[in-house]
UniProtKB/Swiss-Prot annotation:
Gene3D superfamilies: Di-copper center containing domain from catechol oxidase, Hemocyanin, C-terminal domain, Hemocyanin, N-terminal domain. The keyword Chaperone does not apply. It comes from Scutigera coleoptrata (House centipede). It is found in: Secreted, Extracellular space. One of its GO terms (molecular function) is oxidoreductase activity. It comes from the Eukaryota. One of its GO terms (cellular component) is extracellular region. Keywords: Copper, Disulfide bond, Glycoprotein, Metal-binding, Oxygen transport, Secreted, Signal, Transport. Residues 1-20 form the signal peptide. Cu cation B binds at residues 367, 371, 407. Glycans are attached at residue 329. InterPro entries: Di-copper_centre_dom_sf, Hemocyanin/hexamerin, Hemocyanin/hexamerin_mid_dom, Hemocyanin_C, Hemocyanin_C_sf, Hemocyanin_N, Hemocyanin_N_sf, Ig_E-set. This is Hemocyanin subunit X. Hemocyanins are copper-containing oxygen carriers occurring freely dissolved in the hemolymph of many mollusks and arthropods.
Length: 685
């Protein structure tokens, strides 16, 4: 346990800083040092096979006083074998995971919570345990000051390919201390054009974000009577918005690399044209994520046929286009009566098939089983005992190009629904009190040109994994990065008083892969939400500068050691959900790819919930991740002003005084630079 203890001293000091530095208005965590130590020690055991087991604690007295039966407890858990991968997409895992979560969430005290967690750890699949434990820590009020390692800290072998894991293991066998392994080399093949997108598809930060989004916005969360009801009021819409944004970022990377827009996988009798090999395995268990060759066909599963999914598809399409959703009691709810987001939320819950779906029996589980049926395409009935593909696991699914093809199919339901809503006319979009008189993007002294490049970074893997038995390891990885840029706005406030403005910043493509100009509809359907924030404006002219470094989750949230990652002056609470800052803009091309920054201003009093306590939501990326304990802070559609459909021409839209467009060139330099972590490592060696 020495390797846990050394790390623990530092992390407890950091957590103490966090607790002292913030005066929470949101629920303030009450975990003391002893609780934090026990929680951290418990998580450190996950995916580390040689840590000695602890004695199973007795059930808490409060558990027994409430009349809960330990026999029922043990009957409800332990069904998913220890060596399997837990899948949030596989409904067969839901009952066990949900039961475990409820035991944790409803524990009366922190001591009870920890005792129940220890019991669960000994009997639950470890993968499932990490998910439900993270979920409970996130939403219990008394654990608000507890930090857990991120999924790539706990399962680095779900993010690093087997050849890298084997090199780490070999270095450990040879007795090397603190080995540094180079994982910056990428394999590309002209026969597989998507291999040139692996820098995005297999990015550690992006895949970690996707996993933790599904923790923060879990499909398993029921409607609890207090904070849960507020928090999940717009969960279905957020499911659509975040995955729509992931799809759009992928589209921009395809355009940057001269590839056509992402195809839609909608005819399930057609072969899956693009294969995918992840080269991933969970080293401790030997579980390998199955390779999918090109042109395989989706086949029926023993528990689910394609015809079942077609029935669900047709029912959801009818609900989206008829504006009428069937409840379980046989009545209908209308979802197209107003411009606002209620219908998107109901539809999103239906499509994700989460526990807030109005009628899961009728509308089924199309999103989750799209993942499952795709993941089991090589061995659908288990005849050969093959593992599942990466689409099965939330931590790995966004690596597969099929993920985006499936989500583009699901995206179509939402688009059809949006076409049935009252459109956004010019009077919905304009605001007579504010205007933008100038917009410029400044990067390294250049106007309206942003350079991107490769950046080497360090992922640290702690001691105790099956491949780091004798020493921790550092892995040099490579990710996309951009030069720092600033968004310079000149804003005219004609309200006659100090005013808070709500600023929305988007990045839009201007041309397709063949350099043809895109229509307004095509542009806005691929719009990427860069930032939303409140800015103060005095009467008259205001010069406002927004730095790219203040947007999204910084690289040091993902890389370096877990302990050092949280030594910062900003002791804000982190849910681990947040789009990586280094992926803020697409790669662009060597000759330069044209895009447009679009900025819209409205009054914060109209569009943003006032008197918000920003410790309640993920300050890094609330637009993508939502909020903790409170309602989503934006008061209109999450995709506004591009949702619902805009009823005007391109010229009319960009001529609105409170909207500004600035064309920019994003140019990939081909350079490779070292991050501060790499520079520090080289200086220390």
């Amino acid at each position: 346990m020495k390797y846990c203890t050394e790390s623990l001293i530092l992390i407890l000091a950091v957590i103490g800083c966090i607790s002292a530095a913030i005066n929470f208005k949101c629920p303030k965590g009450t975990a003391e040092e002893k609780h934090q130590k026990e929680i951290y020690d418990l998580v450190q055991r996950i995916n580390r096979p040689l840590i000695p087991q602890f004695k199973e604690p007795n059930f808490p007295t409060s558990f027994l006083i409430k009349g809960k039966d330990p026999k029922e407890f043990f009957q409800a858990i332990g069904h998913l074998p220890k060596k399997e991968v837990f899948s949030l997409f596989d409904e067969r895992h839901w009952d066990e995971a949900m039961t475990a979560y409820e035991y944790l969430y409803e524990a009366e005290t922190l001591d009870d919570f920890i005792d129940i967690a220890k019991i669960l750890y000994l009997h639950l699949n470890e993968d499932m345990f990490y998910y439900v434990f993270s979920f409970a820590v996130l939403y219990r009020k008394d654990t608000r000051n507890v930090r857990l390692p991120q999924v790539h800290d706990v399962y680095p072998d779900k993010f690093l390919k087997t050849d890298i894991i084997n090199k780490i293991k070999q270095a450990n066998y040879q007795g090397k201390q603190h080995p540094v392994i180079d994982a910056t080399k990428e394999f590309h093949d002209l026969r597989n054009p998507v291999s040139y997108l692996h820098y995005f598809l297999e990015d550690i930060g992006m895949n970690s974000h996707h996993y933790h989004w599904h923790v923060m916005n879990s499909a398993l969360r029921k409607a609890y009577p207090t904070e849960g009801e507020k928090k999940f009021y717009r969960k279905g819409e957020l499911f659509y918005h975040m995955h729509h944004q992931m799809l759009n970022r992928y589209e921009l990377e395809r355009l940057s690399n001269g590839l056509p827009r992402c195809p839609t996988f909608e005819n399930w009798d057609d072969p899956i044209a693009e294969g995918y090999a992840s080269h991933l395995a969970v080293d401790r268990t030997g579980y390998r994520y199955t390779f999918r060759p090109d042109n395989l066909h989706v086949r029926d599963l023993p528990e689910l046929t394609k015809d079942n999914m077609r029935v669900w598809r047709d029912r959801i399409f009818d609900a989206a286009t008829s504006c009428s959703v069937l409840r379980e009691n046989g009545s209908f709810v209308k979802i197209c009566r107003t411009r606002f987001y209620g219908g998107l939320n109901i539809l999103g819950n239906l499509i994700e098939s989460n526990l807030r779906s109005i009628n899961r029996m009728f509308y089924g589980n199309i999103h989750c089983y799209a993942h499952v049926i795709a993941a089991r395409v090589t061995d659908p009935d288990g005849k050969y005992g093959q593992g599942n593909g990466v689409m099965y696991d939330v931590a790995t699914s966004a690596r597969d190009p099929l993920f985006y093809q499936w989500h583009k199919f699901l995206d179509h339901f939402f688009y059809e629904h949006l076409t049935k809503l009252p459109t956004n006319h010019l009077f919905h979009l304009q605001n007579p009190d504010v205007s933008i008189t100038n917009l410029e993007i400044i990067s390294n002294g250049r106007k309206n040109e942003i350079h991107t490049f490769w950046e080497n970074d360090i992922m640290e893997i702690s001691k105790g994994h099956s491949f780091t038995l004798n020493s921790d390891a550092k892995v040099k990885i490579q990710h996309l990065q951009h030069e720092k840029f600033e968004i310079h706005l000149t804003v005219q406030n004609d309200k006659g008083e100090d005013t808070d403005l709500f600023v929305r910043i988007f990045l839009l493509p201007l041309e397709d892969e063949e350099s043809h100009e895109l229509s307004l509809e095509e542009m806005v359907r691929m719009a990427v939400d860069i930032e939303k924030r409140v800015i103060p404006a005095k009467p008259g002219s205001n010069d406002i500068v927004i730095s790219s470094r203040s947007i999204g989750a910084p690289a040091n949230k993902f890389f370096g050691s877990f302990e050092e990652r949280y030594i910062s002056e900003d002791c804000n609470f982190h849910s681990h959900c947040g789009w990586p800052n280094y992926l803020l803009v697409p790669k662009g091309s060597s000759q330069g790819t044209p895009f447009a920054f679009v900025v819209m201003l409205t009054l914060a009093e109209d569009d943003f919930t006032p008197n918000m306590d920003d410790t309640c939501f993920c300050a890094d990326s609330w637009s993508h991740c939502g909020s903790l304990f409170i309602q989503y802070p934006e008061n209109v559609e999450m995709g506004f002003p591009f949702q619902p459909i805009i009823e005007c021409t391109k010229e009319e839209f960009f001529a609105l005084p409170n909207i500004a467009k600035q064309e920019v060139i994003i140019k990939f330099t081909g350079e490779t630079k070292d991050s501060p972590l790499v520079i520090q490592l080289e200086n220390d060696s």
